[in-house]
Swiss-Prot record:
GO terms for biological process: cytoplasmic microtubule organization; establishment or maintenance of microtubule cytoskeleton polarity; karyogamy involved in conjugation with cellular fusion; meiotic centromere clustering; meiotic spindle formation (spindle phase two); microtubule anchoring at mitotic spindle pole body; microtubule bundle formation; microtubule-based movement. Residues 421-756 form the Kinesin motor domain. Residues 1-152 are annotated as: Disordered. This is Kinesin-like protein klpA. It is found in: Cytoplasm, Cytoskeleton. It comes from Emericella nidulans (strain FGSC A4 / ATCC 38163 / CBS 112.46 / NRRL 194 / M139) (Aspergillus nidulans). GO terms for molecular function: ATP binding; ATP hydrolysis activity; microtubule binding; microtubule motor activity; minus-end-directed microtubule motor activity. It comes from the Eukaryota. Residues 134-152 have a biased composition (Basic and acidic residues). InterPro entries: Kinesin-like_fam (IPR027640), Kinesin_motor_CS (IPR019821), Kinesin_motor_dom (IPR001752), Kinesin_motor_dom_sf (IPR036961), P-loop_NTPase (IPR027417). One of its GO terms (cellular component) is microtubule. Gene3D superfamilies: Kinesin motor domain (3.40.850.10). Residues 106-119 have a biased composition (Polar residues). Its main location: cytoplasm.
């Protein structure tokens, strides 16, 4: 009795586990639930999952709380019958195991055909809402069971009611078993096929597993070897790095020590040599200037005398030519008369008898005319000799003029060399209308009325820690200083001699350097700037040299360096950044060409004005905090001058480069961001490269490296910055106090350039074979 009660208390529904469905249901010989599903299968996992899901969906059924509590029969389809039968079989099989003494005599089928049991009527407890309340429900049912242990009749009554319920449901399931048999046969055949596929899949899985194990072992060995090699490599690298650091430190210490000693010795020697050289140079300059002044005055006087003699000779030659022409006309007339007389003489010969007197007269006349012709011939020969002498004198005068022109070019080049092959001019722009006078810094020009070579800048007031207010003076000296009142015409008067050197066959480079907004573009590219004035002077000089046998052809290019890329400013606007221009150098001839760049034949100065307008429209400009129209690129106007003297066969090739550099600026002042930031960085980088090139040229080393290739700007101007050229730098400064720091930086760089000597320029001429 106690055993039965304990079994009833362990079951959720009293009396369920004590019933044996195999003893009650005659059709309980079906396989154990899950036997088919648990068999090995060779089909893919997807099909197996689908089958399992479908079986679960069919056999799960709604929860028992949703079923009828009075045990009413519910209709099923064929698929539902099969699923319910399978679930019932599993429940019956699970309940058929021995549970105690009561299980041998009492048995029963599950209450429903689904996998979940129906709740019993009467005193059966309701199923919990969730599976988490199982223990609580069992505790509640255990309490009822304990109360039922003292009432044997009540227990028997419960068992009988349960038995009657099971019997009714078993009879209901018997009607559904026929459909389940047919489904079972179908599934048995399917199970056979699946078992065969499973065996094949199992063999394949075993083979793949063996291969995977082999691969894993090889991979593990390779990883171990790699880790060992990496560890050895890291150890070796650490040793090498430590050894190298030690060696570098020792070498650096020794080098610094020797360098300091050499530097001190070199500075002392350099100071002494510089003092001696400056003294000698000053003496030599004075002597050369005196000689040049004498030569200039003598040359000018000789040229004047030669010109006067030449004019006189030309006038005499013209008069002689006129006399000769009149004599020739008279001689022709006399010859015609003679011919007429001879004809008359022939006619009169037939009438000799009657015309003897006439013949005598005619003979006398003929003799007279013949004697006059001899005198005329002698006069003609005398005039012809005078003309030949005059032409010889004219040729001698022209040859003397050509020699004087050659001497002038030589003396002109010597003067330019004495002034320095690299010269620096400083120009201070005037204040604009929107800039007040109070905003200007204090500039003074100590020698403004004399040589105009010095500029003095008074810095702002600075208060020391002791309370003393001081001002710092900054003194600079250049080849020429132009104040705010200077015009472009005054500036061009100083550089016109360099333009003449380009006509003589030298490479000349004139470039403007300075911060943004300091007036570089106005100085170079305005309508009265250096570029138009230089072209006008070249045309005027070339025209005057035509009578000395020179013929010049001129061609120009206009390009810009924008973000280290070359753009053709004379090309089409839509192709500005699409054409790829390349720089080609002919090292033997010292010539530079730009591929695919537009080359324009300059036939008149007016063409230059149209070219400047087109280039200004294509040039890259943008607004910054420092300048509302700031040039964002370096523009280079390249003018090639090819001259040929058809008398002497001499040929000259010169190049004039007029460069308008983009404004140097500090990022903190310009406030550039985005594209403007990139432009500013490229501008400052190229200007720094220009300074490096000039510094390297100033060292004067014969085989020293000159970093032309560090920037497109310096690479393009390679032959115009080297020793075979004449270079002029304009440093443009702003007069405003707010720009004082940038002004001082520009002037210091200009001083560095001014102290640089780049060698002697070479004339590019050759004599044509005549």
């Amino acid at each position: 009795m106690e055993n039965v009660q304990s079994r009833m208390q362990g079951s959720r529904i009293p009396g369920l586990k004590e019933m044996n469905p195999s003893g009650t249901n005659a059709r309980s010989r079906l396989p154990q639930p899950g036997a088919i599903a648990n068999k090995p299968t060779a089909v893919p996992q997807l099909a197996r999952t689908r089958s399992t899901t479908e079986s679960t969906r069919i056999g799960a059924g709604p929860p028992s709380a949703a079923r009828s509590v009075n045990g009413a029969t519910k209709a099923h389809t064929r698929a539902n019958s099969y699923a319910n039968s399978s679930t019932l079989t599993r429940s019956a099989s699970a309940a058929s195991r021995p549970r105690g003494p009561l299980s041998s005599s009492t048995s029963g089928r599950p209450k429903t055909s689904m996998s979940t049991s129906r709740r019993p009527n009467g005193h059966a407890l309701p199923r919990p809402a969730t599976s988490l309340d199982t223990h609580q429900e069992e505790r509640s049912y255990g309490g009822l069971g304990k109360r039922g242990e003292w009432d044997q009749d009540e227990r028997e009554q419960n068992l009988e009611s349960l038995f009657e319920t099971f019997v009714s449901r078993i009879s209901q399931q018997g009607q559904e078993s026929s459909g389940l048999k047919d489904a079972l046969e179908v599934y048995k055949s399917r199970v056979g096929e699946l078992e065969e596929a499973k065996s094949e899949q199992t063999e394949q899985n075993i083979r793949l597993k063996v291969e995977l194990d082999v691969s894993k072992s090889r991979l593990a060995e390779a990883e171990d070897a790699l880790k060992n090699a990496q560890r050895d490599h890291e150890i070796a690298i650490d040793e090498l790095m430590s050894r190298q650091r030690a060696e570098c430190e020792s070498v650096r210490y020794e080098s610094q020590k020797s360098l300091d000693a050499l530097k001190a010795q070199h500075e002392s020697e350099l100071k002494e040599l510089r003092r001696q050289f400056e003294r000698e140079l000053e003496d030599e300059k004075c002597a050369r200037v005196r000689e040049l002044n004498q030569l200039h005055s003598k040359t000018a006087l000789d040229a004047q005398l030669s010109q006067i003699e030449l004019d006189k000779t030309i006038k005499e030659l013209a008069a002689t030519r006129e006399d000769l022409q009149s004599l020739r006309t008279e001689l022709d007339r006399e010859r015609k008369n003679t011919n007429n007389l001879r004809q008359n003489l022939d006619t009169a010969a037939s009438n000799s008898v009657t015309l003897e007197s006439t013949i005598s007269a005619l003979k006398a006349r003929i003799e007279f005319l013949e004697s006059g012709r001899e005198e005329q011939s002698e006069a003609f020969e005398r005039l012809n000799q005078q003309m030949m002498d005059a032409m010889a004198e004219t040729n001698a005068a022209k040859e003397k003029l050509r020699r004087e022109e050659t001497l002038r070019r030589k003396l002109h080049n010597q003067v330019q060399e004495l002034k320095g092959n690299i010269r620096v001019f400083c120009r201070v722009r005037p204040t604009l209308e929107n800039e007040g006078a109070s905003d200007a810094a204090q500039f003074t020009y100590p020698d403004e009325g004399e040589d105009s070579k010095e500029i003095n800048i008074i810095g702002p007031e600075e208060k020391s820690s002791f309370g003393t207010v001081t001002r710092k003076n900054h003194n600079f000296s250049f080849d020429h200083v132009f104040g705010p009142s200077a015009q472009n015409s005054d500036v061009f008067d100083e550089i016109s001699q360099l333009v003449q050197s380009a006509l003589d066959g030298y490479n000349v480079c004139i470039f403007c350097y300075g911060q943004t907004g300091s007036g570089k573009t106005h100085t170079m590219s305005s309508l009265d700037g250096m570029i138009p004035r230089a072209v006008h002077q070249i045309y005027e000089t070339a025209t005057s040299l035509e009578e000395k046998g020179w013929r010049y052809t001129m061609e120009g290019n206009f390009v810009e360096v924008y973000n280290e890329n070359l753009n053709d400013l004379l090309g089409k606007a839509e192709e500005l950044d699409k054409k790829k221009l390349e720089i080609r150098h002919d090292m033997q001839r010292g010539k530079t060409t730009i591929t695919d760049a537009t080359t324009v034949q300059l036939e008149s100065p007016e063409m230059v004005e149209s070219l400047l307008k087109r280039a200004a429209a294509n040039r890259s400009v943008a607004a910054t905090k420092a300048n509302e129209r700031s040039s964002r690129s370096h523009s280079i106007f390249i003018l090639k001058l090819i001259g040929e003297n058809y008398i002497t066969g001499e040929r000259s090739e010169g190049t004039l480069n007029l460069v308008d550099l983009a404004g140097s600026e500090r990022l903190s002042h310009s406030g550039a961001t985005g594209d403007r930031l990139k432009e500013t960085q490229n501008i400052n980088r190229s200007l720094s490269c220009l300074g490096d090139v000039i510094a390297a040229l100033g060292q004067g080393k014969k085989d020293g490296h000159i970093p032309y290739r560090n920037s497109k700007l310096t690479y393009l101007l390679q032959f115009s910055l080297g020793g075979n050229s004449k270079t002029l730098m304009f440093v443009m400064v702003s007069p405003l106090q707010a720009h004082l720091s940038e002004t001082l930086t520009s002037l210091k760089f200009a001083t560095k350039v001014h102290n640089t000597h780049i060698g002697t320029a070479k004339k590019q001429t050759r004599v044509r074979d005549v």
